[in-house]
Swiss-Prot record:
Keywords: Aminotransferase, Biotin biosynthesis, Cytoplasm, Pyridoxal phosphate, S-adenosyl-L-methionine, Transferase. GO terms for cellular component: cytoplasm. Its EC number is 2.6.1.62. The keyword Protein biosynthesis does not apply. It comes from Corynebacterium glutamicum (strain ATCC 13032 / DSM 20300 / JCM 1318 / BCRC 11384 / CCUG 27702 / LMG 3730 / NBRC 12168 / NCIMB 10025 / NRRL B-2784 / 534). Substrate binds at W51, Y144, K272, G306, R390. GO terms for biological process: biotin biosynthetic process. This is Adenosylmethionine-8-amino-7-oxononanoate aminotransferase. It is found in: Cytoplasm.
Amino acid sequence: MENPSLRELDHRNIWHPYAAPGVRNRLVTKTDGVFLTLEDGSTVIDAMSSWWSAIHGHGHPRLKAAAQKQIDTMSHVMFGGLTHEPAIKLTHKLLNLTGNSFDHVFYSDSGSVSVEVAIKMALQASKGQGHPERTKLLTWRSGYHGDTFTAMSVCDPENGMHSLWKGTLPEQIFAPAPPVRGSSPQAISEYLRSMELLIDETVSAIIIEPIVQGAGGMRFHDVALIEGVATLCKKHDRFLIVDEIATGFGRTGELFATLSNGLQPDIMCVGKALTGGFMSFAATLCTDKVAQLISTPNGGGALMHGPTFMANPLACAVSHASLEIIETGMWQKQVKRIEAELIAGLSPLQHLPGVADVRVLGAIGVIEMEQNVNVEEATQAALDHGVWIRPFGRLLYVMPPYITTSEQCAQICTALHAAVKGK
């Protein structure tokens, strides 16, 4: 038998995200800065930050140094009954970075699991309040919170990617998709009034993606809407869960979409950029109020969750280094510049046939088409211009690393022009 190529082995045996078995994939041999090196030796700009995570670029020397130092000491140890310095130092830095808006941190392996933990927190805290009937979540349509079961239940049940599981997932309560950015105060007020009518005796918490709905459609909305949702939670004594897995750590131009706008959630999920895209890791932060309610007998007495790799020392050390880079504040100028360059580079596409909308926020650029995108054709058109993108549905979009230069940003815009035009 001939020795099959790596790509052939991949094609034969490895399952990739959101795909059937046997899909052909491009082979990456190296990453460095904003670049991916492909099997043929060509380099392309990773305009996706490898699914929105590699905000400092790939192989940042501070992250690599932190990882190597930690590997030499302790790469993993169980967190049940034990603790370690990397987790303690990271927690201190993470809480400081949030302006000490939270008091407790639960670490997990991925963003989806951090959402599962957040929902557990809210449901247990409701029981601790003496409200065992509060077993549901209220959210809005066009949302996405992950692919594990309870996280799927708060994704859009019809237009999202999990409609297959209708009837199996826990049933939650859904408001319509939120008004988009630039909506009138009247439209926002009317929306909030209709949302308030859905807060019945079964609702424990409202969970939302603030400012940007990610994989549910890359939809932007206004701060006033988030303020209104927070007000509803306070008025009705319900918990507010914010999923900042995509928006956290500067992606929108604010460090956090909620906290930076003076809003105080009860529970917040972060992930993706937490390690600077170095490895999978996430965290769920909560206030002392939530923690104390969970600690009551009615609340269960303890949070019943414990991943094997919870607070992995290697991930904690790399995350600490990533947050140190964030603390320098360089990201603010970088994201502001990228935003201006994406606006200038993508706005001309607004008037092309087939383009429904062009929108930019921070280091996020979105082109919404009138019809579904031919993913392979659009991807190849961008690759022909030296840029890696990953379209879905009707969307061509980019979330480049913050270190992307002006020249590279211009190249990304050129590639998106080609992807829209199909050449």
